[in-house]
A protein has these predicted regions:
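Extracellular/secretory pathway-exposed regions associated with glycan biology
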Residues: 1-32, 192-217
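Accessory beta-strand-rich segments of carbohydrate-active enzymes
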Residues: 8-10, 14, 19-169
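Activation corresponds to long, low-complexity, non-globular regions
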Residues: 130-217
């Protein structure tokens, strides 16, 4: 699996992206585990059934991921992984120190980064024949969601107010039989941290690896 994003996305703020990947299961696997993380948040469905949300908030150097047991959600034949990703798209939680606003005692300066919405996902299935893997790559379909207003005010240092237009929702896009042929593919993020974080201070890049995937505790 590789970090992916919508093919035409600029580094905007307050963005929502839909991702889909259809695949075929000949026989139900003995075990199926899906590992997933996103920048900044995700909602996950398998065949229209919601499985979870995440990841946990973290320092960007240690990116948390979630693991879901999805065996009971799979079916013989066509299946789909559907993910809604949300991205702040800009640095958040900046603790700025100025002459008139000194940093409070005991508070450390937090990492501030700009980012593009990204998804990293891998489904691992064990069968009697051989293990099968479905990982995020350029074959995944992606679409910039029009259901949310992106021009909204911040309600604190981290999050924006949410305005959702239900009438704009694409019906059944989380289902396996949805026709996504008109959706574009995804772009693979390459380079520093998958090319997502554009504002990180790289002076400490000698710490290897800079971004470590950590399972949710």
């Amino acid at each position: 699996a590789v970090w992916i994003c919508h093919e035409d996305d600029p580094c905007q703020t307050n963005m929502y992206l839909n991702f889909r990947k259809t695949f075929t299961v000949q026989s139900l696997p003995e075990k199926a585990t899906l590992h997933i993380t996103a920048d900044t948040q995700y909602m996950l469905w398998i065949n229209g059934q919601e499985l979870g949300r995440g990841p946990a908030f973290s320092d960007p150097r240690w990116q948390p991921y979630d693991s879901h047991d999805v065996g009971s959600f799979l079916q013989a034949g066509a299946n789909v992984i559907a993910v809604l990703c949300y991205s702040y798209g800009q640095g958040v939680n900046e603790d700025t120190q100025t002459e008139n606003r000194p940093r409070p005692a005991g508070r450390m300066k937090r990492n501030v980064h700009d980012s593009m919405p990204g998804l990293l996902c891998q489904l691992e299935m064990s069968t009697s024949d051989a293990p099968t893997c479905v990982g995020s790559d350029e074959s995944w379909k992606s679409l910039l969601s029009k259901c949310w207003c992106t021009d909204t005010a911040k309600i604190d240092d981290s999050t924006y107010s949410e305005i959702y237009f239900a009438e704009r929702e694409t019906a059944n896009w989380k289902e396996a039989d949805f026709d996504d042929s008109s959706w574009p593919g995804s772009t693979v993020r390459t380079g520093f941290l998958g090319g997502m974080y554009t504002g990180l201070d790289r002076s400490h890049a000698h710490v290897f690896p800079w971004c470590i995937l950590e399972p949710r505790q």
